Amino acid sequence: MQTPQFLQQRRKFAAAFLAFIFLLAVVDTAEAGKKEKPEKKVKKSDCGEWQWSVCVPTSGDCGLGTREGTRTGAECKQTMKTQRCKIPCNWKKQFGAECKYQFQAWGECDLNTALKTRTGSLKRALHNADCQKTVTISKPCGKVTKPKPQAESKKKKKEGKKQEKMLD
C-alpha cells in the first residue's frame, strides 16, 4: 500500500505536470499568433473617379429623384450606378438645381428698363456641379406699397359693423 506522503507527492507532480503542459499550450498559441501573415495584396484600382449626372426629379421640378454615375476603367466591376438624390424646392432653378447662391438685396429700379436687379455669389454646389461663380437676376419694378396688417383691418371692420348696427 502507498503511504499518504507518496500520494501527496504524486498529486503535486501531476499538478506540476499539468501546469507545465498548460504553459506550453499558452506559449505555443501566443507564438502562433505572432507568425508573420502574408501581406494582403493592395489592389490598385484602374477605375476612374465617379462622374455624376445632374439630379433628375421623379416628379415635378424638385423633390426626390435619381442621378446616374459612370466611371471608366478596364478592370472595374461596376462602371454605372444610380443614386437617389433630392433637389431642394426653394432653390433658384434657373441657375441649376444643384447650385445654391447667396443673394444681395434688390437694387434700385432702373427707369430705362423698368427692372431692378440683384446678384448672387455661389454658396454651395452639390455633387461637383458645374455652377457659375456669380449670377444676376432681374424682376420688374413694382409699386412700393406697405400692406396693412390684417389684425388692424379686421378690427376696424368689426367696429364699423357695430356702429352700423347701433345706427339701425
Swiss-Prot record:
One GO term describing the cellular component: Schaffer collateral - CA1 synapse
Q: Which UniProt keywords apply?
A: Disulfide bond, Heparin-binding, Mitogen, Secreted, Signal
Region Chondroitin sulfate A binding, as annotated, extends over 147-168
**Region Chondroitin sulfate binding, annotated ranges:** 92-99, 123-131
Q: Which GO terms describe its molecular function?
A: chondroitin sulfate binding; growth factor activity; heparin binding; integrin binding; protein kinase binding; protein phosphatase inhibitor activity
The stretch of residues making up the signal peptide is: 1-32
Where in or outside the cell it occurs: the entry states:
Secreted
Q: How is it modified after translation?
A: Phosphorylated by NEK6.
Region ranges (Disordered): 139-168
- Report the record's disulfide bonds: 47-76, 55-85, 62-89, 99-131, 109-141
Q: Does the keyword Secreted apply?
A: yes
Give the InterPro entries listed for this entry: Midkine_heparin-bd_GF, PTN/MK_C_dom, PTN/MK_C_dom_sf, PTN/MK_diS_sf, PTN/MK_N_dom, PTN/MK_N_dom_sf, PTN_MK_heparin-bd_GF_CS
Q: Which BP terms does GO give this entry?
A: bone mineralization; decidualization; dendrite arborization; dendrite regeneration; estrous cycle; integrin-mediated signaling pathway; learning; leukocyte chemotaxis involved in inflammatory response
| PROSITE patterns reported for this sequence | PTN_MK_1, PTN_MK_2
- A Pfam family this chain is assigned to: PTN_MK_C
The record's subunit annotation is: Interacts with ALK and NEK6. Interacts with PTPRZ1 (via chondroitin sulfate groups); promotes formation of homooligomers; oligomerization impairs tyrosine phosphatase activity. Forms a complex with PTPRZ1 and CTNNB1; this complex inactivates PTPRZ1 protein tyrosine phosphatase activity through PTN interaction and stimulates tyrosine phosphorylation of CTNNB1. Interacts with ITGB3 and ITGA5. Forms a complex with PTPRZ1 and integrin alpha-V/beta-3 (ITGAV:ITGB3) that stimulates endothelial cell migration through ITGB3 'Tyr-773' phosphorylation.
Q: Which family does it belong to?
A: Belongs to the pleiotrophin family.
Free-text function comment from the UniProt entry: Secreted growth factor that mediates its signal through cell-surface proteoglycan and non-proteoglycan receptors. Binds cell-surface proteoglycan receptor via their chondroitin sulfate (CS) groups. Thereby regulates many processes like cell proliferation, cell survival, cell growth, cell differentiation and cell migration in several tissues namely neuron and bone. Also plays a role in synaptic plasticity and learning-related behavior by inhibiting long-term synaptic potentiation.
Name by which UniProt lists this protein: Pleiotrophin
